[in-house]
């Protein structure tokens, strides 16, 4: 069964992915490009070039699930960096699906001071 438990690890395949790919094509990207096990219980999310569709792949122990969301208007705030995998929480994935960004503009950036006065 599809696992939507709060502790589920979600990986975002940053950049654009050809969403015409199905189970085997997406699993191959996970295995060959990102060197991860597509048969883990993790969720792997992919976005198209126009950022109007997201496809999520998850193995449940007996088969793959594919979930897909396509927007009628607007676009997802998907990370740009190609060839990178970003680990997010399930809650953050819900934010993406609701149109929010993980890096909202105007938020303070974390700093790491090197000198203590």
Predicted regions mapped to residue ranges:
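Polybasic/polar functional segments that serve as interface/processing modules
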Residues: 1-117
């Amino acid at each position: 069964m599809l696992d939507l438990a709060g502790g589920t690890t979600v990986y975002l395949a940053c950049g654009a992915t050809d969403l015409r790919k199905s189970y085997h094509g997406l699993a191959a990207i996970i295995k060959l490009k990102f060197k991860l096990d597509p048969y883990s219980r993790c969720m792997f999310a992919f976005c198209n070039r126009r950022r109007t569709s997201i496809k999520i792949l998850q193995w449940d122990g007996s088969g793959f699930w594919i979930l897909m969301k396509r927007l009628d208007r607007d676009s997802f705030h998907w990370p740009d960096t190609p060839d990178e995998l970003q680990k997010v929480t399930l809650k953050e994935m819900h934010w993406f699906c609701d149109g929010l960004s993980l890096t909202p503009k105007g938020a303070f950036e974390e700093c790491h001071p090197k000198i203590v006065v």
